[in-house]
Amino acid sequence: MSGHILTVGLIVVVAHCATLSSSASTIPIQSQGKDFPVPFVSEQTDDFYDDKFYPDISDDNINEVVRDNGRKGGDRGRQSTPSGKESHPSATQTGGRRPSQSPCGESRPSGSATSGRRPSQSPRGESLPPATLAGRQNSRQQDRRQNKKQPDLSKYKNSPARYIFTTGNVDSGKTPDEERIFRTNRAEYVLATGGPYDNYLVEIIDGPNPNDISLKQSTTMGGDSKLILDNPNRNTIVGRIKTFKA
């Protein structure tokens, strides 16, 4: 009886050793480490992983490898989105160009450029409002248009005045800073523009009676003054304007 038990035990031990020797080369994937063989792909047999070392991997559940089909610049395939997460689209760039940037890497603000010019300033260094600049430009343009239309008035250079209009206190013996001869038949004619404290002397050489015309002086927002000859009957007037700067 004891001999039978020993024989059966010996058979069990031998069978167990045989099982261990046959499974010595099997390495479950859970125990894979850096010293174990890496799975390889066999395109001829579609046997994606080595069954000798990784028998617990099911080849039937492995997706087929996306092949290049002869195209250049390999296709990297699509990336799957993990469950429970939403994929966010990448930002679209217009025309394939990056937004304009300064040398420091900061985005340049949009808008119109100033062409490198500084805003106009007053003699004290203060910036003038746009309305003042527009008023000055209009006055200068109007003066230029009037001067272009002036005929040759040199014959009136030494002609005496019939009567005189003045603004402020004008010293008749003082030499004027500016002097010119004019001719007009407009209802309103700009004689001169200047500072708010400038004085003017207007000599009428040829024209209507003094009661038919008058002078008026206005000051713009920027502080400039404008001397206007009021001629409601539109009579032809020839005169001389003298400007005395303050």
Curated annotation (Swiss-Prot):
Residues 79-124 have a biased composition (Polar residues). Residues 1-23 form the signal peptide. Residues 51-160 are annotated as: Disordered. It is found in: Secreted. The keyword Mitochondrion does not apply. GO terms for biological process: immune system process. GO terms for cellular component: extracellular region. Salivary gland (at protein level). The keyword Secreted applies. It comes from the Eukaryota. Immunogenic; triggers antibody response to Phlebotomus papatasi bites in humans. Immunization of mice with the protein results in the development of antibodies specific for mouse DSG1 and DSG3. Exposure of people to Phlebotomus papatasi bites results in the development of antibodies specific for human DSG1 and DSG3 the titers of which are correlated with those of anti-PpSP32 antibodies. Interaction of the protein with human DSG1 and DSG3 may trigger the production of specific anti-DSG1 and -DSG3 autoantibodies and promote the development of pemphigus vulgaris, an autoimmune bullous dermatosis. Down-regulates the expression of CD86 and HLA-DR on the surface of lipopolysaccharide (LPS)-stimulated human peripheral blood mononuclear cells (PBMCs). Reduces LPS-induced secretion of IL-1beta/IL1B in human PBMCs. Reduces LPS-induced secretion of various cytokines, such as IL-1beta, TNF-alpha/TNF, MCP-1/CCL2, IL6, IL27 and IL-1alpha/IL1A, in host cultured macrophages probably via inhibition of NF-kappa-B signaling pathway. Reduces production of IFN-gamma/IFNG, IL4 and IL6 in human lymphocytes activated with PMA/ionomycin. Interacts with human DSG1. Interacts with human DSG3. This is Salivary antigen SP32. The gene is sp32.
